[in-house]
């Protein structure tokens, strides 16, 4: 394993590294915990290693053994970002490099785990059964299981997961045996195995009332019974995308490629969990127009999952490459040679938006392609920068060496680093080594400026604008009408708009948003103010308020809020309280907040009332955006737990450990099963939990914050948002 300095992990893979983990998990919806054991196979990397250190967050540790014997261990003082290091002392310091050990840990998760969202029946489509799903990226896997939670450590895993008999369990792996029903008939156990090494952030679990539809021999679409057919229709091109990706990147190594369409609180557009991509239901447009997200997630099967950024500072190697692959897949599948340039232009625009927002919040340093993340939560640095600035770098290299040569290089790059990790310097060296005959074309390529300069790239790309011009031309027609203070346009071209692809419609609306944002837009055009009658005429022509396309709906809402057209506010509230996709929720909450007055108050109150609906990651980020301090106390369990029910006992070796470890700096120690489980039971019985149920969906007419009547409020000015994190334009995690 290549050495690395991972600032986001407290583990020690440079001394002792995990290679495989066997998981036994028991999912308890009543208490909202997973009781589990993790048996690690580890390898000594450095002679004389004395400890195996893992990352944990909000986990209760029960017992620890090394090669079957009780081990000394401690959970150190909790770091506010990185959690608590689990320090397991090895029985001797005489280990040599290459030796292998087995380390077994019993533990249980917390209802406050940031990796797990527990949904009550009311938050599911069916409304009758609870649901859970996990999200490990970037550094949340440590709240699902003790792990070396850094991308540089790649492991294989197997798992046996016990769930209620009515439920189906899915994981980021291949099913290794048929489900087994318990003798009492109240539970089933599902078995999984992942043979391709992967980082811990890709360990994923979903449990719910699920059905599947086959798309091909290696692709299924999973979702709740009432949604699965819609999802199967919208994602019916999955096999076609996968075949196109293989032509560009090489053989698909993961066996199956299934898709799970999750409940609406899933915080991202998609997550590339191996063998089982998670996606948001906001992609279900009914016309397959948002299926490009599937192409993005499929691309990650090579760039991100097979070849992985070594640390989060080099995240662009995951996402920039994936944008490049996605755009090539979609160009091939659509048969439109202009798709690549058109989509790249939209990505460049989202990069400009991200840079502007980071600059306004005083966090421009996070727009470096290789940022310094020391002391920074990787979630706070998340934006379109690694996606689109990373893509821009690759696209510029492609321009210099030629398209065919770069396509061949992409395959060689993936082959060279498959099942491994890579950083920016290694990528640079590998690229230059493959093009010794292109010295002239690459001589003035400033690698350091690309990697370490904040802001936009110094080299502005040139793209074919043909597909853009139609959309922007119609937008300019409406803008000219606004400048002329008329209430409609002579020719709204309704039929043309309806025939456009989703990205073209978004381009039209985004152009109008840009024109209404400042004194001049990104192209220097003078800004305009859109009157209420003009917006109503636009809505009548294109049915924008009623659209089922989430991307179009989002842009329309932004445009109306920028124009202070408060008729849209109830619709915005309905949107942000009906789904938790951060690409949409965060900007719309910020837009409401920026309006000031009643809009700001309503944004804050709505979020507070609905906070438990959102995934913990989304909840945390929106709270930062709105400067809200949420009580993150645990929820009260429906029934109590005992040490025995957790599979833990008060053994003498566990209890004596606290003394044998000496004077550790730990304040939050777990001296074994007794102290760990007892602390957990105290936490569970503290009564501090917030109820996770929600009431209704925020309803169209009155809006989720309460059906107060709206009045025009004076604009209090632009509020500088505290959080630096920005949404991804239209890329996968958005």
Could you tell me what each predicted segment is?
Residues 383-384, 389, 406, 418-423, ...:
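Long, ordered, helix-rich scaffold segments
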Residues 192, 221-480, 485:
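Hydrophobic alpha-helical and helix-loop surface patches within well-folded domains
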Residues 1-255, 382-385, 401:
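Acidic/His-enriched low-complexity segments
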Residues 394, 720-721:
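Structural signal for hydrophobic/aromatic residues that build the beta-strand cores
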Residues 702-712, 722-734:
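Short hydrophobic alpha-helical membrane-entry/anchor segments
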Residues 46-48, 94-98, 179-187, 286, ...:
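Short, glycine- and charge-enriched coil/turn segments that flank and shape catalytic ligand pockets
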């Amino acid at each position: 394993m290549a050495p690395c300095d991972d600032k986001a992990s407290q583990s020690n893979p440079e001394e002792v590294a995990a290679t495989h983990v066997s998981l036994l998990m028991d999912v308890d919806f009543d208490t909202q915990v997973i009781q589990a054991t993790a048996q690690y196979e580890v390898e000594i990397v450095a002679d004389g290693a004395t400890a195996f250190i893992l990352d944990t967050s909000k986990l209760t540790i029960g017992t620890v053994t090394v090669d079957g014997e009780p081990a000394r261990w401690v959970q150190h003082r909790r770091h506010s970002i990185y959690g608590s290091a689990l320090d397991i002392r090895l029985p001797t310091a005489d280990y040599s490099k290459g030796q292998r050990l087995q380390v077994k840990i019993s533990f249980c998760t917390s209802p406050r785990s940031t990796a797990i969202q527990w949904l009550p029946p009311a938050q599911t489509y069916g409304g009758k059964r609870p649901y859970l799903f996990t999200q490990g990226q970037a550094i949340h896997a440590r709240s699902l299981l003790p792990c070396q939670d850094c991308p540089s450590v790649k492991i294989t895993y197997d798992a046996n997961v016990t769930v209620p008999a009515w439920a189906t369990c899915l994981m980021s792996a291949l099913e290794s045996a048929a489900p087994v029903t318990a003798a009492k008939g109240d539970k089933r156990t599902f078995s999984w195995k992942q043979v391709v090494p992967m980082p811990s952030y890709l360990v994923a679990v979903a449990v719910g009332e699920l059905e599947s539809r086959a798309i091909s021999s290696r692709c299924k679409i999973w979702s709740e019974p009432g949604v699965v057919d819609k999802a199967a229709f919208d994602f019916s091109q999955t096999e076609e995308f996968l075949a196109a990706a293989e032509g560009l990147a090489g053989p698909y190594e993961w066996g199956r490629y299934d898709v799970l369409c999750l409940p609406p609180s899933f915080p991202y557009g998609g997550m590339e969990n191996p063998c089982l991509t998670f996606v948001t239901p906001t992609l279900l447009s009914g016309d397959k127009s948002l299926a490009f997200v599937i192409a993005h997630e499929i691309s990650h099967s090579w760039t991100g999952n097979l070849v992985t950024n070594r640390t989060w500072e080099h995240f662009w190697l995951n996402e920039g490459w994936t944008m490049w692959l996605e755009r090539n897949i979609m160009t091939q599948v659509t048969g439109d040679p202009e798709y690549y340039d058109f989509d790249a232009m939209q990505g460049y625009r989202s990069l400009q938006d991200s840079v502007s927002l980071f600059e306004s919040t005083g966090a421009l340093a996070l727009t470096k392609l290789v940022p310094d993340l020391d002391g920074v939560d990787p979630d706070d640095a998340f934006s379109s920068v690694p996606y689109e600035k990373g893509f821009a770098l690759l696209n510029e290299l492609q321009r210099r060496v030629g398209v065919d040569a770069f396509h061949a290089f992409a395959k060689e790059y993936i082959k060279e680093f498959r099942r491994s990790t890579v950083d920016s310097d290694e990528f640079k060296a590998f690229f230059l080594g493959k093009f010794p005959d292109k010295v002239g074309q690459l001589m003035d390529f400033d690698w350091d400026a690309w990697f370490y300069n904040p802001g936009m790239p110094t080299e502005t790309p040139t793209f074919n604008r043909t597909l853009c011009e139609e959309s922007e031309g119609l937008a300019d027609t409406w803008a000219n009408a606004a400048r002329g203070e008329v209430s409609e346009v002579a020719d709204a071209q309704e039929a043309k708009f309806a025939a456009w692809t989703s990205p073209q419609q978004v381009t039209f609306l985004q152009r109008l948003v840009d024109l209404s944002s400042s004194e001049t837009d990104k192209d220097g055009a003078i800004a305009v103010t859109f009157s209420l009658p003009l917006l109503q005429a636009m809505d009548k022509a294109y049915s924008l308020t009623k659209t089922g396309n989430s991307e179009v709906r989002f842009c329309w809402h932004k445009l109306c809020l920028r124009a202070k057209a408060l008729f849209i506010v109830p619709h915005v509230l309905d949107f942000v309280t009906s789904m938790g996709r951060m690409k949409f929720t965060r900007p719309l909450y910020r837009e409401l907040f920026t309006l000031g007055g009643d809009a700001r108050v309503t944004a804050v109150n709505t979020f507070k009332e609905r906070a438990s609906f959102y995934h913990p990651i989304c909840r945390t980020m929106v709270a930062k955006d709105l400067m809200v301090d949420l009580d993150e106390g645990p929820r009260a369990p429906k029934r109590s737990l005992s040490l025995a029910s957790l599979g833990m006992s008060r053994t003498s070796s566990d209890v004596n450990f606290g003394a044998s470890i000496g004077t550790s700096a730990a304040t939050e120690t777990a001296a074994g099963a007794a102290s760990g489980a007892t602390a957990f039971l105290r936490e569970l019985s503290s009564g501090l939990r917030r109820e996770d149920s929600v009431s209704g969906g925020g309803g169209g007419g009155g809006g989720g914050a309460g059906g107060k009547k709206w009045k025009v409020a004076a604009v209090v000015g632009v509020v500088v948002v505290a959080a630096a994190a920005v949404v991804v334009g239209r890329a996968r995690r958005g």
